[in-house]
Amino acid sequence: MSNITIYHNPACGTSRNTLEMIRNSGTEPTIIHYLETPPTRDELVKLIADMGISVRALLRKNVEPYEELGLAEDKFTDDRLIDFMLQHPILINRPIVVTPLGTRLCRPSEVVLEILPDAQKGAFSKEDGEKVVDEAGKRLK
């Protein structure tokens, strides 16, 4: 079993790039398709705490439930926002990666490089062609 977990949405380019950077470090992570298998309340609360971000910082804004539920308004408690994320997992921003070195919301995808225990094994370019890692496994920016 891997010591790296990614909360992944295969329809998201950032999530796909993050997954491939994990694989480029020589590790096959545990992949949780969070839209199909959302975290429990306790898991979500722990992820947020471990990332050191606010509940609202994990909330996706460019999806239908955000508008429909009026989540732009600052009237909801953190507990209520978590309820909405559990009811509508599409509201959870992604990808979230958990490693022995930390937990991060990997936006942009290069954030994952900060918490991977093993170095990149070679060059890596994002799906759009942007070069992120050189042939020696070193981050370019």
From Swiss-Prot:
Record PROSITE patterns: ARSC
List the active site.
C12 (nucleophile)
What EC designation does it have? 1.20.4.1
Q: What induces it?
A: Induced by sodium arsenite.
Enzyme class per UniProt:
oxidoreductase
Q: Name one Pfam family in it.
A: ArsC
Classify the source by domain of life.
Bacteria
Give the matching CDD domains: ArsC_ArsC
Q: Which UniProt keywords apply?
A: Arsenical resistance, Oxidoreductase
InterPro entries (UniProt xref): Arsenate_reductase, Arsenate_reductase-like, Thioredoxin-like_sf
**What Gene Ontology terms for biological process does this UniProt record contain?**
DNA damage response; response to arsenic-containing substance
**Residues under site feature: Important for activity:** H8, R60, R94, R107
Citing just one GO molecular function, the answer is: arsenate reductase (glutaredoxin) activity
| Reactions listed under catalytic activity | [glutaredoxin]-dithiol + arsenate + glutathione + H(+) = glutathionyl-S-S-[glutaredoxin] + arsenite + H2O
Family note: Belongs to the ArsC family.
Q: What's this protein's function?
A: Involved in resistance to arsenate. Catalyzes the reduction of arsenate [As(V)] to arsenite [As(III)].
Annotated protein name in UniProt: Arsenate reductase
Q: Which organism is it from?
A: Escherichia coli (strain K12)
Taxonomic lineage is: Bacteria, Pseudomonadati, Pseudomonadota, Gammaproteobacteria, Enterobacterales
Gene name of the encoded protein? arsC
